[in-house]
């Protein structure tokens, strides 16, 4: 079972709302076939949170969202 906490991710992205948006956007990228930056045995949402907690993905995800 995946063990990732919001507190681990909040160290990288302190704003909870930006964290949720960044994780959502990254999870969508993973579903579309982008390569995971960490071990990807979990669902895309958990993998996205693991990437954020590891510092592999950050707030820059929000700058890539098309308007």
UniProtKB/Swiss-Prot annotation:
Function: Promotes RNA polymerase assembly. Latches the N- and C-terminal regions of the beta' subunit thereby facilitating its interaction with the beta and alpha subunits.
Keyword set includes Transcription: yes
GO biological process, any: DNA-templated transcription
Alphabetized Pfam families for the sequence: RNA_pol_Rpb6
InterPro entries in the record: DNA-dir_RNA_pol_omega, Pol_omega/Rpo6/RPB6, RPB6/omega-like_sf
Alphabetic keyword roster: DNA-directed RNA polymerase, Nucleotidyltransferase, Transcription, Transferase
Any one annotated GO CC term: DNA-directed RNA polymerase complex
Entry superkingdom: Bacteria
Catalytic reaction equation(s): RNA(n) + a ribonucleoside 5'-triphosphate = RNA(n+1) + diphosphate
Name of this protein: DNA-directed RNA polymerase subunit omega
MF terms in GO: DNA binding; DNA-directed RNA polymerase activity
Family membership: Belongs to the RNA polymerase subunit omega family.
Listed EC numbers: 2.7.7.6
UniProt-listed NCBIfam families: rpoZ
Enzyme class: transferase
Native source organism of the sequence: Ralstonia nicotianae (strain ATCC BAA-1114 / GMI1000) (Ralstonia solanacearum)
Protein's UniProt keywords contain Signal: no
